[in-house]
Every structure is written in C-alpha cells, then in structure tokens.
Amino acid sequence: MTHYHNPLNGRKVLNQQFVLQAPFLPCGDQPEAIRQLSRGILDGIPSQVLLGTTGSGKTFTMANVIANVNVPTLVLAHNKTLAAQLYQEFKAFFPENAVEYFISYYDYYQPEAYIARSDTYIEKSLLINDEIDKLRLSATRSILERRDTLIVSSISCIYGIGSPDNYSSMALILEVGKEYPRSQLSAQLVRMHYQASASPQRSAFRERGSVIDIFLAYESDLAVRLEFVNDTLVSIEYTDPLTMIPSHTVPSVTLYPGSHYVTPEAVREQAIRTIREELEQRLLFFEGRPVEQERLFQRTTHDIEMIKEIGFCKGIENYSRHFTGAAPGEPPTCLLDYFPEDFLLIIDESHQTLPQLRAMYRGDQSRKQSLVEYGFRLPSAFDNRPLTYEEARRYFRRVVYVSATPGELEVQESRGHIIEQIIRPTGIPDPLPEIRPATGQIDDLLEEIRQRLRKDQEKILVVSVTKKLAEDIAAFLAELGIAAAYLHSGIETAERTQILTDLRLGTIDVLIGVNLLREGIDLPEVSLVAILDADKEGFLRSSASLIQFCGRAARNVHGKVIFYADRITPSMDHMLKETERRRQIQLDYNKKHNITPKPIIKPILANPITKEGAQEDSRPETQSTEDLESSIKQYEEAMYKAAQDFQFDEAAKYRDLMNAAKRQLLFKQGEDGNSK
C-alpha cells in the first residue's frame, strides 16, 4: 500500500501550528472531553468515541482537540451537506490554517455499465464541477506542503485517485536566477495538464514576450507571473489573476499539476507495456468469442494510443493500477495515502458513516462484473474502486468516532474509551417524549401544529413512515392554509434546497419527511418533533434514530417531542431511558451552576452575492440552481470581455460576482446529501 511520501526534492513540509480562534471558551462537559480525547491520542490510544448530544458543541470540542494534538487531520462526514457545514465551521475556527474541502466533483454522473439481458451498453456520462475540482486539488496540495492541514471530506476520500508519488513528482519547482528553456517549460506545463490560453482561466498559462502567466489549477484568487531575461528566470510574482496587479514577490514557487492523474513519462511507458500484456492474456481468454475479443481489442488499443499521444484517455481511471504499479487486488491509492502516518481521523456521525464505508465496495464491483465479462473492460478495471472497509481500517491508527448514538462497531473498536459530552452550553435539557395513541394521530397532530403556529417563529418537523404519507399530510395541511412541505429522496436537489431554505426563512412552517436525519436539519426554530407510527420497528425507528429525532427539538427552550404509538417497542423503551438519563444530567448541572436554559442564536445563511451586486443584476437574493448556473456563465463572459478590453476594475467586479455565485451553487449542490 502506498503511504505518505513527499518527493519534492527533499523539501521540508511546513510545520505550522493549528491556531484556534473562537469568541467563547469550552464549558460544560467540553473541557473534560477535550482533555480526555487529547490525552488519549497523545498516549497512543488508537480509537476513542465522543458520545455527544445534539447541541453540546461537538464541533468546537473537535476543533480544540485538533489544536491540542496539532497533526494533519481528516474529518469524514457521511454526506455533502454535513461536509459543507463542517467545512464552514472549521474555516471559522482555523482562519490562519489550511482548512480544505474534498468531495465528489461530479455535478452529474452516469457510470459505465452493460446490461446483458437486453444487450444494452451505457457509456459513462459525467459533468465535473470546476469549483469542486479546484478545491480537491487545493486539498492535496496543502497536505503535501504543510502539516497544519485539516481536510473535511465525504466518503469520496476512499475512492481511487492518482498516487501521491506520481502527482507530487510532476510538481514543478522554479527558482529565481536559474535557467529554464522556454519551450521545455511550456511543454512541461502541458504535461502537467495546463493548457495554453490567451484568456485567464483555471489550469492554463499564457505567454507574452518575456512573461509567462500561470493560472493555477488549485487557486482562483492568485496567479503566478514568471519574468525571464532570455531563459533566465529573474522574477516570480503572485498576482491578481484578472488585473495581474502584483501581490507579492517570492524567490521560488512550487507549481502542482492540474489533475490527480498526471504521470511521469517513464511511468506512462511502463503502464502501456503492462496494459498490452494484460490485453494479450485477456484476448486468449476470449478465444472462441469473437464479438468480445474484437470489442476489447478495439477499445483497449484506442485507449493505449490516446495515452501515448496525450498522456490521457477517457476512462483512464480503469487502468489506474498499471500507473501505480499495484498488483491485482491491491488497494487503490486514495486521499488517505496523501496523509502522513501520524494523521488524526475524525469520523463524524459515525453511526451512519461506518455503514457507508462498508457498502461502497460491493455496489462498485457488481456493476463492473458485466463490463469485464463481456469485453468492455480489462479485469484491471476491478481495481479502480473504493477501498473495502477492511482496507480503510488500516488507516484507523488515530481515530475519534463522533456521534450522539454510536453504533456497536465504534463501541467495540474503542474498547471502553468512550467520552461523554451530555451538557449543553445553552442549558436546554433533552425534551422527554410524550407517548400518544397512533389512532387519531393526524387530528391530534393538527391541534399541536395550530398551538405552535400561534407562537412566533416556531417550526414543526413531522416524521412519517412512507413517502406517500408525507405527501398526503403536506397536501392535507396545505388545504387548511398551513404552510407545509414534504421532503424525501424523490425530490430534485434544487427543489429540496429551496424547501430547506424556505423552512429557515419562515416561508414554510411544517416539514414532513421520512428520513429528516440525513438532511442535516438542526434548527433552533424547531419546537415540535412528531414521529408518526413510532411503534413500527425498522431502521428509522431504531433506538439510535429515535434519539436523533429527539435531538432535533433540543435546541429550543420550548422543545417538545411526541411519539404516536399504540405500544412501547424495545427501541422506544431504550430511547426513553437514555433520554431521561441525559435529561437528568443536564438538569442537575443547571441546578448546581444556577443556569437558566436559553436558546441559541443561529444566523440564517445569507446569499453570498452582495446586495449591491444582486441589485445591479436585478436578480432575487435566493436563486435556483439553474439561475445560479446561468449567472455564473454570464459573469464569466462579462469578466473575460472586460479583461480583454483592459477594463480591469470591471473585470474584477464580475470575477467577485462569479466566485460568490459559485460558492452559493456549491452550497446548494452539497444539500443533495449524496454520500460521495
């Protein structure tokens, strides 16, 4: 297995400190949790659990532990929504450090597949999000360059990317005073996946007389300007990528590739040889099956020619083990391989994230089986895959599992090293659920909703057992003039994002769904959580899920939870006992310290586009995904036109508007909850 390597000519990785900045100090259970977790990591305890209730400040505790331990850190979240939220929070806690974001960069992804029964081949189709691609490259650049790096990632971190050895060996180190033949330098930039372009754009370079401007693949706010006298490099400046106004001068610079899949020429030649060898063996296997034999020969030889000519081909990831030198069946290289041996792994919402880690491999292998069996791909395609859970566990050398309801697996792995964080800084205790009959539950719920709506700014979450029931209840409430909406996996990303925004802004008062846990809904405005048919045992009626649902009302001083059930199931019984235990701990603490429960003030996330910019563009502050994509395209065109006309102030304005729209689009797309 490939592990951390820094082959940048022996250059030292920057050993900066994590500097935590926060307007408050640890309180309640936080100081002891921080002390125990930090000491456990430094003492070599491989696995610990932070059992923290909703609203107890687990993220702040994690930030303090990271600052204390001071090693590169990976925070793993189970979906894009939570990854985005954690990224924003950690950026605020560590503004001087490298806080990065690594999720799947596909806006749309249809994997390659073959359906044998209908003889249907589905070609891979995808749309890559340029902004996320930049953030992914920024993440790997940071972890190779500096130890004060914190990467927040989705499950995407266990999927194969190019090896850190190949990636970093293609980095280009330039120093003032040295000679670099211009033609060779340009050719090297092309091999690094930078393209020659007259316009300023990411992953491109522009030659003008004695100057080469490089627009970095992993940075949108800075470009690099190289100035030469003949072939001697006399100046390196960081500049604004549009105005090219210098920011600061440096004696040297390291330029990283524009793709994780770049490879040195020697590696590429070796890969071509081993691909041909595998092809020859597979053609013998298909002896007597001319259709599969011809198909595989044509497809693979075409790919080989593309790799020879341009160093890349469509679907090159299917040949990944040939480029990394791995043996068949060996784990692929992934983001985890970019980290040093002593890195800290924090698995957030571990009760959901660990089952995901287990599931990723099986789904990937079943799809590729028919592609290999019918000659669309070589068997080495099987090795372009996510890690198995057992392979991923090899990286669990220093891990903290974080959850309000840790699963059996985390508890076993931690071997008793479970640190509780029950006390909420707000003083709000867990609401003790009321059990009411399931018979007549809708009428009873309606009365509860009406009582809540008489109060200002209070919201209601309703958990149903089926999508159809969620839709029916929303329609029923709407007929009665109640602002209600349903939310489930059948809702498109853009619409789901808008529903969540409307709930926060007050346009919607009641939200009905099947699995509202996955949406990351944690709002102080929610004062009532109602679980319909709570006695129907299943995944979303397990004791862990029921405790999580209760936590959704624990941020409001008037929080109330109602379980509609005709019997108390074992899951409900466990939930009631655990909730009472946690509630009593909080009440005792409040009494001892004379604390009065108070609500938290959680600001509504504003549109990142400035008011001035929004007014000039005459668009509403809350835009749909389609509107944002259209805005980005318009701003980009206007930016390039202004730059070409040397109207740099105007170009910078459109650049800022475009980047703000990209950030908002990234946040919206994160709301889809896709695991990668």
UniProtKB/Swiss-Prot annotation:
What Pfam families does the record tag this protein with? Helicase_C, ResIII, UVR, UvrB, UvrB_inter
Q: Which organism is it from?
A: Chlamydia muridarum (strain MoPn / Nigg)
What InterPro entries does the database record attribute to this sequence?
Helicase/UvrB_N, Helicase_ATP-bd, Helicase_C-like, P-loop_NTPase, UVR_dom, UVR_dom_sf, UvrB, UvrB_inter
What broad class describes the main subcellular location of this protein? Answer: cytoplasm
This chain's protein is named UvrABC system protein B
Q: Which Gene3D superfamilies match?
A: P-loop containing nucleotide triphosphate hydrolases, UVR domain
Where do the annotations place ATP binding? G52, T53, T54, G55, S56, G57, K58, T59
Q: Which family does it belong to?
A: Belongs to the UvrB family.
Motif Beta-hairpin is found at 105-128
Q: Which residues form the Helicase ATP-binding domain?
A: 39-424
Domain free text: The beta-hairpin motif is involved in DNA binding.
